[in-house]
């Protein structure tokens, strides 16, 4: 298995170094649900601004304030503790009376707005996130500048970030131990983290091998192609390669890579043979995913940051803004820009 730090770069290994998250204000995340509260219903959507506290901690504090069980407060995704983040929480509070959430007080947390909503906010039910990052102590400004320009055109590898694998790769190591011993894992959180790490590592490996090819975005026979921004996909055939290549070049279609698991991976012929060869040595992790009935899926191979802009405060400090769809990692963008000091694993997804 390729170590995360050794995964293939799309734009070559960065020449410069820099510091990511010198302080929480250097990593700002604003959650984009893609919809507005209904204005009625038994749930309350609460938009919060937090700094220095994790999502679960705030959710538990909100439940205590509302005098409801912690399981009645949900969220679309975890946000980093060591960052300034805006996100929505959802509390189930039936009844016509609206509680005064302006009275909710928690150090490092502020209620920005709240409104009634008809449905529970479920994990993953967001459109994406807007990021504002500040990179400090940047060396080789010219290299970083050129990479930003290139990323606007060619994107970055859609790798799962190091945080998916846990501090020191602990989640992936747990998955490997589980696969090797076949000992039942009772803890539901561990099961989820370990299976996710296993599948993510296999995806990263497939993408890393594909990036070694001369023309990364060249459609091959049997590729599974996805409409940009959609989850559905279809298989490329030799008769239509030229037209499909044009649509890929126009970013209308995206080449996908496998999220291995049980069932068919989705690719066929040449593309399927390539993917199978890329992870052929990882038989234990593949067997674990099949045994635990984790269904195979597809994920875009490349990621195109939207609304990408940047501003150099001085020769060694740059502010970068961009928007990413749900499930994508800001650290996978930063990885193509600079060699960062520190460990990504503490940064929440």
Swiss-Prot record:
A Pfam family recorded for this sequence: TruD
Highest taxon of source: Bacteria
Family annotation (SUPFAM superfamilies): Pseudouridine synthase
InterPro entries listed in its UniProt record: PsdUridine_synth_cat_dom_sf, PsdUridine_synth_TruD, PsdUridine_synth_TruD_CS, PsdUridine_synth_TruD_insert, TruD_catalytic, TruD_insert_sf, TruD_pseudoU_synthase
MF-aspect GO terms: RNA binding; tRNA pseudouridine(13) synthase activity
Enzymatic class: isomerase
Active site residues per record: 80
All residue ranges annotated as the TRUD domain in the record: 155-303
EC nos: 5.4.99.27
Keywords: Isomerase, tRNA processing
Gene Ontology cellular component terms for the protein in this record: cytosol
BP GO terms, sorted: tRNA pseudouridine synthesis
Binding positions for substrate per the UniProt entry: 27, 129, 329
Keyword field contains Nucleotide-binding: no
Catalytic activity from the UniProt record: uridine(13) in tRNA = pseudouridine(13) in tRNA
Keyword Cell cycle listed: no
Assigned protein family: Belongs to the pseudouridine synthase TruD family.
Function comment: Responsible for synthesis of pseudouridine from uracil-13 in transfer RNAs.
NCBIfam families: PRK00984.1-4 (NF002155), tRNA_TruD_broad (TIGR00094)
The name this protein goes by in its record: tRNA pseudouridine synthase D
Organism: Shigella dysenteriae serotype 1 (strain Sd197)
Lineage: Bacteria, Pseudomonadati, Pseudomonadota, Gammaproteobacteria, Enterobacterales
